[in-house]
Amino acid sequence: MGALARALPSILLALLLTSTPEALGANPGLVARITDKGLQYAAQEGLLALQSELLRITLPDFTGDLRIPHVGRGRYEFHSLNIHSCELLHSALRPVPGQGLSLSISDSSIRVQGRWKVRKSFFKLQGSFDVSVKGISISVNLLLGSESSGRPTVTASSCSSDIADVEVDMSGDLGWLLNLFHNQIESKFQKVLESRICEMIQKSVSSDLQPYLQTLPVTTEIDSFADIDYSLVEAPRATAQMLEVMFKGEIFHRNHRSPVTLLAAVMSLPEEHNKMVYFAISDYVFNTASLVYHEEGYLNFSITDDMIPPDSNIRLTTKSFRPFVPRLARLYPNMNLELQGSVPSAPLLNFSPGNLSVDPYMEIDAFVLLPSSSKEPVFRLSVATNVSATLTFNTSKITGFLKPGKVKVELKESKVGLFNAELLEALLNYYILNTFYPKFNDKLAEGFPLPLLKRVQLYDLGLQIHKDFLFLGANVQYMRV
């Protein structure tokens, strides 16, 4: 029966992680909701895992005293116990408001085979036995919490077990005699099993499951320099209909994590329970990512003449600029130009019902490439555009795509006189549409992972956009090995 305990991680971890100390108490950036439908699916999968596990274990030996008529009191031993077959019919996993989860298994039976010995001072009997255990019922309440590291905790707050019937058939030396007193043997067998089931479950929760939870990573790698923080901001919340797990959801630079000035907004989640799981993802998650990529310089770019299409009317040369910036051509005749773009502040994604948008602002500095290989600054442009964003999610991650609008260019500073900066809009539009945004869309296509266990996939996906957050709904399929 120890497998009942060892199979608990298969049931629970598929729910708890379907997963910084200073973040405790803050608003979550990401919430995972497991509905009653999802809990029942987890119970079903857990029952299958348990049934498979039971057939691979050896039960512990147990001994005791037995009074045999005409022989007297002897010492019995049941050993080499193996589960030959099992049938687990019903299981349920329900939220317990304010506490955690209640796991129950009922109407189950197992058949155990093994060896027996009976010792008396002047003789020893031995043989084999076959035990049929019917009507097994187990109920365990699991208290869920979180520790300062942001990892989940679990304790078995209560446990009860019951066995309706035990039938023992013994063979071997005088096995027929012992079978005459099967009621006494079966009663002892039943008491031993009932007492050990909860003992082994509670031991497994404290010695196996809880230590395992402490090894779970609270960060997940996104790419070569960015990670996402999946630590819990508080203990999982259980209500009558669901279990909700709150994650920090901050994306940060792996090598030098800086304090984030952004705050995650309070998310008012829709009361939806039709799917197995839901994920609420705050704009905080995406905007902390923007801060990291801005800090890394990922948003900076440069444009040189060899990047301009051959049929362009404007080249990045002082000669090409002569018609509208004549002073530039006079001061720097027949020289090439380089445009260096940067984003002064990280662009923030705006969520409104049914819509995603971002309004990036860029500055572009123009340099003349001197014969000495040095660069001479000559003017600065400001570039504004509005961008619509599309986010989707698949079986394991969220991906995105940016669609930019038309750019608007203004001259901010100039050492070569005033000129109409709008003449550069066509050139900048070409670069932004064909190089700058494709680079970002390639990164967004890589996506960032949802807090799922291995071999867990999502299907029947649905996406809603609310103020300040995305709301994703899905059903779950566990891919068995």
UniProtKB/Swiss-Prot annotation:
InterPro entries xref list: Bactericidal_perm-incr_a/b_dom, BPI/LBP, BPI/LBP/Plunc, Lipid-bd_serum_glycop_C, Lipid-bd_serum_glycop_CS, Lipid-bd_serum_glycop_N
Tissues/organs with expression: Detected in blood serum (at protein level).
Any single Pfam family the record assigns to this protein: LBP_BPI_CETP_C
Keywords recorded for this protein, A-Z: Antibiotic, Antimicrobial, Disulfide bond, Glycoprotein, Immunity, Innate immunity, Lipid transport, Membrane, Secreted, Signal, Transport
GO CC terms: cell surface; extracellular exosome; extracellular region; extracellular space; membrane
Disulfide-bond pairs as recorded: C159-C198
Glycosylation sites: N300, N355, N386, N394
Matches recorded under PROSITE patterns: LBP_BPI_CETP
Molecular function as annotated in GO: coreceptor activity; lipopeptide binding; lipopolysaccharide binding; lipoteichoic acid binding; signaling receptor binding
Function: Plays a role in the innate immune response. Binds to the lipid A moiety of bacterial lipopolysaccharides (LPS), a glycolipid present in the outer membrane of all Gram-negative bacteria. Acts as an affinity enhancer for CD14, facilitating its association with LPS. Promotes the release of cytokines in response to bacterial lipopolysaccharide.
Subunit relationships: When bound to LPS, interacts (via C-terminus) with soluble and membrane-bound CD14.
Protein name: Lipopolysaccharide-binding protein
Gene: LBP
